[in-house]
Each structure stands twice: as C-alpha cells, then as structure tokens.
Amino acid sequence: MAREFSLEKTRNIGIMAHVDAGKTTTTERILYYTGKIHKIGETHEGASQMDWMEQEQERGITITSAATTAQWNNHRVNIIDTPGHVDFTIEVQRSLRVLDGAVTVLDSQSGVEPQTETVWRQATEYGVPRIVFANKMDKIGADFLYSVSTLHDRLQANAHPIQLPIGSEDDFRGIIDLIKMKAEIYTNDLGTDILEEDIPAEYLDQAQEYREKLIEAVAETDEELMMKYLEGEEITNEELKAGIRKATINVEFFPVLCGSAFKNKGVQLMLDAVIDYLPSPLDIPAIKGINPDTDAEETRPASDEEPFAALAFKIMTDPFVGRLTFFRVYSGVLQSGSYVLNTSKGKRERIGRILQMHANSRQEIDTVYSGDIAAAVGLKDTTTGDSLTDEKSKIILESINVPEPVIQLMVEPKSKADQDKMGIALQKLAEEDPTFRVETNVETGETVISGMGELHLDVLVDRMRREFKVEANVGAPQVSYRETFRASTQARGFFKRQSGGKGQFGDVWIEFTPNEEGKGFEFENAIVGGVVPREFIPAVEKGLVESMANGVLAGYPMVDVKAKLYDGSYHDVDSSETAFKIAASLSLKEAAKSAQPAILEPMMLVTITVPEENLGDVMGHVTARRGRVDGMEAHGNSQIVRAYVPLAEMFGYATVLRSASQGRGTFMMVFDHYEDVPKSVQEEIIKKNKGED
C-alpha cells in the first residue's frame, strides 16, 4: 500500500499537562473533530475514549499513554495522550522521546502547576517544540493572562498569546485571532458553527497591544523580521506565521492559545496551530545512534529510502492480541511478516502483525513508513527503549532514561494458587513498566515491589487483581533508601581457602571513589602486567555489583560509586572466578570502614496550596518533617508553598493537611533527588534493619 500522507503532512504530537487540567477531554475533542469518534465521552462520567483501562475510567485519570492516529486538514496527526499524575512520569518521558512536538494544556484558573513544571522540564531536556492551550476558560476564576504570566514566572518560557479570549467563565463565547485580527464567535454547543467577525470594539485596544507584543517577540528570534520591524515596515500575516513556526520548531518561542475543551470552544483552532506551528518529521534533526559493529556515530534522516530504524517506546498486554510493542519509525519502511534486528539485545525478531491504534481499538496495516507510530504483535525479546533496525544496517538509538523507584511495599499471595499466578503477573507488569521493579528479599523470601509513588503501586496491585485474577496481601509502603560512599579509599580483598585438593585464591586492591549523582556504579580495570589475569576481571566487577545490591550499612542498594581495580595477585592452580568474586566483595566490606558510607533518602518537591490563614501551619508542617521551604507565592486568597521534604516524612500528610485547613488545602509531590539522611536518622534506620529496638 502506498504512503497515504507525505512526511511534510505528518505530525507526531503529545498532549501533556498537570493532572485535572482537562488533557484527556482535550484529546477526546480532537478525536471528535477529526472524525474518529461520533459521541463525546466525558472523563468525569468515566466514559473517555483514550482512558481505556478500568482503573483509569474509575479514577478519572490517564495512566498509560494511548497512541491514536487522526486526520486534520489533509494531515495525519499521531497523538499520544500522556498522564498528568507524577507517579506515571516514565509514561511522559517515553512519549516525549518519540514525539516531534507537544501541546501543553493548562487549567486557566491555576496556570502552571507542579506537574506542568515536571513535564515542561522533561520536554526541554528532549528538545520538544510546544504550543500551549489554556483550557477551562469557562471555569469560575479562569484568567488567561494570569496563565500566560505563570509560563514566564515559573518556567521562564518565552511564551506569548496568539489568541485572546472574548469573555471568561460563563460569558466565554469566542476567541480573537491575533494574526488575522478577527474574532471567532461560537454559536452552538458543539463548537461546529463558528462566525468570523470583526473584533468587538471593547476588545480592539487590547488586541492591538498584544499583536504588537507578539510581533516584537517573534522578530527577536529572526534577524530579517527584526530589521523590518525596526524600520517600521509592515510584517505580513504570512511572514508572522512563518516566523512563529520557525521559532517554535527551534524551541525559542511558545505560542499560547485559549479555549474550553469541555464546552467545545477553541479545539479546532488549536488543531490548526498543531499543523501550522509544530514540526513534521522533516523539520527535526536526523536521529543519531551508534553502529554496534564500529562504535561510530551514525544518523538516520526521516526518509522511506533510508534503512529501517525504529525505537520501541512502550510494551502493553492487550486482552485480545497479547503483547503489543509500540514503536516510532524514524527511517525506512517496515512490512508485516518481515524480520528486524533488535540491536539493543542483539536478537532477531519477526514482525507478526502491525496495528495502528485508536485508544483501544485497532486497525491492521501491512506497511508502516518513516515518521509513523504503530504497534507490532509477536516481538518476544523487545522491551522499552530497544532499537529495531534493518539487519544489514545496524544502529543503536539513544534509549529512554528510567528514573529510580522511590517507594516499595511487600506483597504476598493469599493462596498457593495465587502464588504461581503472582510471579507471572508481576513479570508481565514489569515488562510494561520499567519504573516498576520486582525483587525477592534474599533473607526472608518476601516479594518486594517498587515504584514511583503510592498511586503507581496501587494501580499495579489493582491490575494484578483484575487482569490476572491474583489476590494478594499488601504491606505498608516503605521508602526506597540507597547507600553510597562519601570519601575515597583503597581496600584489599583477600580470599584464600585450602581444604584438601584444589583450593581457592583471589587477591584484589580496589580504589573506591564517590561518583556524580545519578551516574550509578562505574568499574574501571587499571591492571597492568597481568597481576590479575584478564579472565578474572569480569568476576571482580560481578562480585562488586552483587555485594552492592545489599549495601554495607543497612542492606540498601549502593549507587554512585566508582571502583578502580589497580592491583592484586593470583595462584596458577587455585584462582577461580568464584574466588575473585568473593575477594571483590571483601574489598567492598573493608572499604566501608574508611569511605564514610551514607544512607540516601528520596527528597520530594512538595507544592502545598492553602488559604492565607493556614500559612503558619504549613510552615510548621514543613519544618517538623525535616523539610526546607524553597519559595512562596500568593495566588488570590491562597498561598502556594514549595518545599523539599523527605518522602519518609510525607506518609499520612494528606490527613494532617486536610484537618489543619478544614479540607481546603491541597498538595502535590514529585520526586526530585536523593540526599544524605541526618546521622541520627541513619542510626535509627540501621537499628531497624538489624532488628534492634
């Protein structure tokens, strides 16, 4: 089948926002106006098309990023709906990795909220161009210009309105287009009848002021436009649109639009802006990767003529077709029934069927082209972040960063029948979600699951019950602590055993130094002259990795340590891999005496919104929880407090805040970084883990 839409007419976009900003409703309206659905589903009624898991429909939030293909103005728009809840950060990250552009949805009463900041930061990291849609203009307290100001103040974004609202709250009835300088008035509830009129007289001065600001902001990103602007020449609408497009694609400018998805206003104009200002696959730089055979950097431009290269960004278990692998094609063409190479794993995979998804319904297709997003059935070894390529033209694309889980709990099956099913269920859920880890406690044999927050683990335990019919008892949430070294040291590990026949002999000297935060464990072999034979070097590294999994203070995994093997000795007969593994672990234990081992705890960025009169209480809460206030700002009659607080101190805080503020206070928290626990707390943790009172 020939390509239906050219690359210029393809858009891969994400819809991202803070929880409850109306993101799923916005996506629903896009599907409605692009002809994908005939009846609109409301999130608060639990009927949304994109939220297709039972847990999502019950909770009214989006958990997994469903991928959908729609058409608008002779363009194909592939949409990824991403969750706004902080516990599902990985879903946002893996979506951003394969998108070309995004629509950031704001609640125009609140403007930029904590999770907006998180996803904005991630989008900036991945260099994703964005347009902003200030939603809920019909809501009480909606304030478009306040929302725009929060983009400047909280995100330092060069964001400017390309539209202004006509009216707000119940009186929101239309939009002023600052490029055409016309008013778009909505005359019916479905938003399908729009009258284009002259701008009402009472809005004309404001419209002219903001058009002038828009022209100036765009001119600052383009030398030619700047010259015209300074010389007082008129900038045409076409030049202005071209300038906005160029600056948006270069991530130098963010157009801001307004509307109410719930009231069907502004969505079509936002779709026009997606086409006008967000990039096609041809507008973004060619994807880079490494050739696994030569280690040389290579690129794959977006073209059907190039060799096939794609990135798997999500695994899902579908109740009807089984395991689905979502992938983004960067170059080349793929046909169902063909073979590809998973270069990340070095394994050959057969593409059974290719499906294009619409929320949770599917259409089977024979061929998928560069720039497209699709799902494959039948891939056995592929996981999130793997590269799939032509067997003759190998390339490994940059993978997806997976954040460390911060919270864990114990799960135990209720019956013997549940025990066997639980292992399979947890394995499948971990395949789908890289931030979900399953471990067995070596000493107790208990199964411990870890994730990004309480809601994250709640949803996974719930899915285990519903989808896999496993009943389990769940323990109280625990913090995922980490351990590290804070000082450099050198330590010897010497292991010798002689008990008749062949003995065991391993001897190593290792230098341990603290590594940069987030760099994990790095091993360096600095042996010269073969004092430790080459075949035993991997055993030394393995011995360290295995020992570090259970720490040196309280049994928590060690992170951010560099180990340099620089000396040692061996025995011609008695040395073995096992002996060197044990020697390495003894070296780590020895190092712990002088390397200032420390326990690290997850620090959360907590944003608390309370009425003015409760500000004192909140400051007290933060201090009592070993937190530190990072900033405050007033918003109407409320105060917004930002603070860094240890996760260990935040359990049960919702109840405390509710009673202190008579139910009017709210808070959001998102993992920010790991930090050393104070000495007194460290001693308590060590005692507790050693079973002392």
Swiss-Prot record:
Main location: cytoplasm
Every tr-type G domain range: 8-282
A biological-process GO annotation: ribosome disassembly
Any one Gene Ontology molecular-function term assigned to this protein's record: GTP binding
Annotated Gene3D superfamilies: 3.30.230.10, 3.30.70.240, Elongation Factor G (Translational Gtpase), domain 3, P-loop containing nucleotide triphosphate hydrolases, Translation factors
Residues noted as binding GTP in the record, renumbered to the chain: 17-24, 81-85, 135-138
PANTHER family listed in its UniProt record: RIBOSOME-RELEASING FACTOR 2, MITOCHONDRIAL, TRANSLATION ELONGATION FACTOR G-RELATED
UniProt family annotation: Belongs to the TRAFAC class translation factor GTPase superfamily. Classic translation factor GTPase family. EF-G/EF-2 subfamily.
Function: Catalyzes the GTP-dependent ribosomal translocation step during translation elongation. During this step, the ribosome changes from the pre-translocational (PRE) to the post-translocational (POST) state as the newly formed A-site-bound peptidyl-tRNA and P-site-bound deacylated tRNA move to the P and E sites, respectively. Catalyzes the coordinated movement of the two tRNA molecules, the mRNA and conformational changes in the ribosome.
Protein name in the entry: Elongation factor G
